[in-house]
Regions:
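Cytosolic regulatory regions of ion transport systems
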Residues: 1-236
Length: 236
């Protein structure tokens, strides 16, 4: 039986919403873009997504969008007030499990809390994707942020119980010179990995790598089992 694809709704199809949609689609998720402005409603620019021309601040729009079937809803408009309304409606009226909201004005950051239905509040497209996949990232390599003006990336992989990496030593991974495991997070503890450290299910491994391999990382991790993907990527 085919694995169910995560359904993600995005309110706001401007540059930010489109960028997030493309990355989530590349990662194998099902995406619906909701846009109320005619000039931004351009299905041809993200053809693999579903589109809805409507105002996501309206309950009727979220009903039409099937918000109750969304695993995640992202409020990605350029208006903080709209993002707060979308987040509150998604959580309180439709019970969306995870709501990610874009903060446009830093002075409004204090409002973006669970009181408004917001699980994760972020300000950049990359952080939005990480916020979305934070709830569904087991077995997936997730890019957290760019480093050194985009020349390198910080990414994480959470090991599921059935992953062949479980029980292996860090030293046996054979990572190349341009990729390093910098931290292991286990049970709330931060561990500096050593060659003899044995990996356990649930471990969060943080990697720093050359940004030029990001697309290869994503294609490999999301298109194959993690152990095979890491072998293909890192050559071990």
């Amino acid at each position: 039986m085919a694995e169910r694809r995560t359904r993600i709704g995005i309110a706001g199809a401007g540059n930010v919403g489109r960028s997030v949609a493309r990355e989530l689609l590349d990662n194998g998720h099902k995406v619906l873009l909701i846009e109320r402005e005619r000039r931004k409603f351009e299905p041809h620019v993200v053809p693999d997504a579903d589109w809805l021309f409507a105002d996501a601040c309206e309950v009727t729009t979220l009903e039409e969008a099937g918000a109750e079937t969304c695993d995640v809803l992202i409020a990605a408009t350029g208006d903080d007030k709209a993002n707060l309304v979308v987040g509150l409606l998604a959580k309180s009226e439709f019970g969306v499990p995870r709501v990610v909201a874009r903060i446009n004005e830093i002075r409004n950051e204090w409002l973006f809390t669970q009181a408004w239905g917001i699980d994760v509040a972020v300000s950049t497209p990359g952080a939005m994707v990480a916020g979305v996949e934070g709830a569904i990232d087991v077995g997936h390599l997730i890019r957290l942020m760019g480093l050194r003006q985009g020349q390198a990336d910080l990414a994480k992989l959470t090991l599921p119980e059935d992953n062949p990496l479980v029980g292996q030593r860090v030293g046996d991974l054979g990572l190349p010179a341009n990729t390093a495991m910098v931290t292991l997070v286990r049970g709330g503890s931060v561990i500096l990995p050593t060659p003899d450290q044995v990996l356990e299910a649930g471990d969060e491994m943080l990697f720093v790598s050359d940004s030029s391999v990001e697309s290869a990382i994503r294609a490999a991790i999301h298109g194959a089992e993690p152990i095979r993907a890491l072998k293909d990527l890192y050559g071990f």
